[in-house]
């Protein structure tokens, strides 16, 4: 199953995609201003072009697991994305610490946002490995 992971932010949306077997997570180019109509269209076009079967959106919960203003904004954006990409399922997944892990990777070939999306996708794939196989 090919999965697209998104690390949403109002300025940029980090993107990563899995291989068809759901084994590898690869960061790809980020999308600027994803909250705009044009940004949502670009995300939807990316999902279709990559032929993904699921989209995973990082949910930025507070350290104690509570919702923050960014959590609420992300939920609203994911709802808009869900409408735009139907019937592709859109799932929210806890993204705590993904940006910190991505920052430590030191890889400068892709944006930190897309590296964070790849960490998110690796976590999601590991949790769902038996469902994908």
Annotated model-derived regions:
Residues 1-6, 10-133:
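Phosphate- and other anionic-substrate recognition elements at nucleic-acid/protein interfaces
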